[in-house]
């Protein structure tokens, strides 16, 4: 049945969710995020605002909203962010309006943010947030990945390794933990988590009326 009445399946609409991936640098969250967006219909990447300089190949509004520090502070004061944080001397924040618009029409929004941002997001959005922490299989594997991706200097890598311990200390604040020893296996784990969360009863708007309508037909 698809006539749009309360008792038809078309009357059930799913509210979107905020799906958070966090990890130390090099553990794989960026790769997993890209794979999820490519293979999961209805999932979109959250676009953050940042004060850091634009890198070669990046596009304003697609990769980030690039703003200066005064503009960022103005947005903070106006309550325009769901979360924001200082990361390596730059500021990052998630604009509220596009996320809320996506959730309202049943789209899921993927966040690549740290523990600090995740806590802020959960305090503002509650059960709309599902969080996953990605762990490396070992410290040695993490350091090897940072070196082989050849994006950072040795000094920056040392800083990221030092920060990794602090980031991992917050693993127990997350809903799910995935160890990324194999990117394909880790992806299937993360995708399964998202699919299960999409089907949770409390996200199905109109489900009570749908079931009630069928019961009335059966009892009538």
Swiss-Prot record:
**Ranges that cross the membrane:** none
Q: Which domain of life is it from?
A: Bacteria
Q: Which catalytic reaction applies to this protein?
A: GMP + ATP = GDP + ADP
GO terms (molecular function) for this protein are: ATP binding; guanylate kinase activity
SMART domains in the record, alphabetically? GuKc (SM00072)
A GO CC annotation recorded here is: cytosol
Gene3D superfamilies registered for this protein in UniProt: Guanylate Kinase phosphate binding domain, P-loop containing nucleotide triphosphate hydrolases
Under Pfam families, the record lists: Guanylate_kin (PF00625)
List, alphabetically, the InterPro entries matched. GK/Ca_channel_bsu (IPR008145), Guanylate_kin-like_dom (IPR008144), Guanylate_kinase (IPR017665), Guanylate_kinase_CS (IPR020590), P-loop_NTPase (IPR027417)
Entry protein name: Guanylate kinase
Compartments where found? Cytoplasm
- Give the family from UniProt: Belongs to the guanylate kinase family.
Guanylate kinase-like domain: residues covered: 16-195
Keyword annotations of the record:
ATP-binding, Cytoplasm, Kinase, Nucleotide-binding, Transferase
Query: Where does the protein principally reside?
Result: cytoplasm
Q: What is its EC number?
A: 2.7.4.8
- Biological role stated in the UniProt entry: Essential for recycling GMP and indirectly, cGMP.
Q: Residues that bind ATP, according to the entry? A: 23-30
Q: Which HAMAP family match?
A: Guanylate_kinase (MF_00328)
Q: Which organism is it from?
A: Rhodopseudomonas palustris (strain ATCC BAA-98 / CGA009)
**Entry-linked PANTHER family:** GUANYLATE KINASE (PTHR23117:SF13), GUANYLATE KINASE-RELATED (PTHR23117)
């Amino acid at each position: 049945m698809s006539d749009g009445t309360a008792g038809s399946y078309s009357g059930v609409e799913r509210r979107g969710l905020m799906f958070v991936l966090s990890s130390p640098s090099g553990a794989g969250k960026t790769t997993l995020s890209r794979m999820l967006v490519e293979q999961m219909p209805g999932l979109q990447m959250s676009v953050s605002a940042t004060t850091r300089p634009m890198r070669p190949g990046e596009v304003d509004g697609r990769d980030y909203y690039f703003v200066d520090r005064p503009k960022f502070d103005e947005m903070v004061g106006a309550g325009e962010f769901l979360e924001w944080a200082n990361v390596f001397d730059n500021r990052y924040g998630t604009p509220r309006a596009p996320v809320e618009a996506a959730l309202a029409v049943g789209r899921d929004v993927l966040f690549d943010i740290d523990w600090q941002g995740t806590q802020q997001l959960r305090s503002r959005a509650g059960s709309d947030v599902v969080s996953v922490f990605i762990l490396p299989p070992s410290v040695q594997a993490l350091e090897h990945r940072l070196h082989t991706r050849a994006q950072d200097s040795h000094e920056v890598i040392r800083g990221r390794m030092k920060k990794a311990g602090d980031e991992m200390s917050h693993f127990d604040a997350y809903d799910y933990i995935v160890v990324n020893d194999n990117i394909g296996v880790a992806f299937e784990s993360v995708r399964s988590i998202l699919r299960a969360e999409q089907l949770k009863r409390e996200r199905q708007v109109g489900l009570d009326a749908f079931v009630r309508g069928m019961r009335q037909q059966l009892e009538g």
